[in-house]
């Protein structure tokens, strides 16, 4: 189908070009004839005025007839326009005198004038002639648009992955909201640091003496302490050793451990300590610890000292109690 359409278009184009050529040639001839008629009339008027010139024309009638025959041959050689340009000016003069009685005979010489204006129509004639010569060439440009169509097809293929890339871009900000700003565990770390305390008191022998191991063991057991973890004694919630440990008792001498067999054991003193917060009521546990320390000191003949190993005073006891309350309130 495409080939048939091409042939039809070529034929129609050729016919149109030929029609244009014929029409142009016909119109050019028509214009030339009109111009030719106007010019001889003007010249004839001038010739009538000149009597001397008329006599010369009558003498040259025979020559004019010969030149008329040449004019008849001129249309056959219409292509040689440039060579005939100088001659037509002299050829027209004699025929005009004879042309007065023979006006119809002057029509063939009209072809002599076209050489002057002939190059103008010949130029458009050559242009359309070149066009049919290139008419078979349009088949090549028909193949060229076929290739861009194929090239245009992959373009949307490349444009398709572009939105896909845009779809991946929003995926990146999705990973941006990281849970890093969640720094809430920091206050959790503050609680143990700010509100942990250890209440310490000592039971020591008088200056220059030591506590007897056997007496110390009996007083410790009477106060409700039981030997246990870390090789030290612990005071539990229940006197039989059950329940959580409320406070503990260690040797004042490093490493602070005891040997259950304390018959031959002596020491300058022992240390009783309680960690706050602790199980139950810390103030009640503190009172129980103070009572145990006083009981042991009375049994072994020692004294109760504070954490600086100074004599225990009522002010120091109130200070211990204030510390316990602060920790208790902070952990409430």
Swiss-Prot record:
Key words of the record: Cell cycle, Cell division, Cell inner membrane, Cell membrane, Membrane, Transmembrane, Transmembrane helix
Name of one Pfam family that matches: ZipA_C
UniProt-recorded name of the protein: Cell division protein ZipA
Primary location recorded for the protein, binned into one broad class: membrane
Region: Disordered, residue numbers: 42-190
Family: Belongs to the ZipA family.
Membrane topology label: Single-pass type I membrane protein
Gene Ontology, cellular component aspect: cell division site; plasma membrane
Summary of subunit composition and partner proteins: Interacts with FtsZ via their C-terminal domains.
Source organism, top-level taxon: Bacteria
Gene that this polypeptide is encoded by: zipA
Localization terms from the record: Cell inner membrane
Annotated transmembrane regions: 7-27
Organism: Escherichia coli O6:H1 (strain CFT073 / ATCC 700928 / UPEC)
Bias (Low complexity): 99-115, 123-150, 160-175
Its biological purpose: Essential cell division protein that stabilizes the FtsZ protofilaments by cross-linking them and that serves as a cytoplasmic membrane anchor for the Z ring. Also required for the recruitment to the septal ring of downstream cell division proteins.
Residue numbers on the Cytoplasmic membrane side: 28-332
Biased composition (Acidic residues): 51-63
One record GO biological process: FtsZ-dependent cytokinesis
Topological domains annotated Periplasmic: 1-6
